Amino acid sequence: MGKLRGFIEFDRTDESYVPVAKRIKNYDEFTIKPSDKELEKQGGRCMDCGVPFCHSGCPLGNLIPDFNDAVYNKKWKNALEILHSTNNFPEFTGRLCPAPCEAACVLGLINPPVSIEMIEKYIVERGFKEGWIKAQVPAKRTGKKIAVVGSGPAGLAAAQQLNL
């Protein structure tokens, strides 16, 4: 997973922000995207833990070491597929989740943890930019209807899964 000694060679990098004076004039994204090379380095910081506690720290059970490794190896589309295997809406969670996975990261015991939330966010951004994310329209509608109570991530995920 990642680079064998990436956690030693690469320092943690976080997103930088647009100055407040500029961002109060619009509703655009206020973070500045790191370069793909920098994101790949951050993926390389993943240590290939024997027991990846980031997994259990993630409420969705995302395959974090796997998508970090894919990003490090420049396999962005594969990283997106890995992310979508456990997360219906990473475009939301990459922005809204408080990232308990980072608090559970083993590297965080001695150094700043892997930038998991940032990597997740930009995997999805890359997916939209490259056109890899498309609407999943069912081939045939059954005509049946169902109600999903709740409009949070779980309710939206249930609605998406039931629509397929």
PLM features: residue spans?
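Ferredoxin-type iron-sulfur electron-transfer modules and their immediate structural context
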Residues: M1-K145
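N-terminal Rossmann-like FAD-binding beta1-loop-alpha1 element of flavoenzymes
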Residues: K144-L164
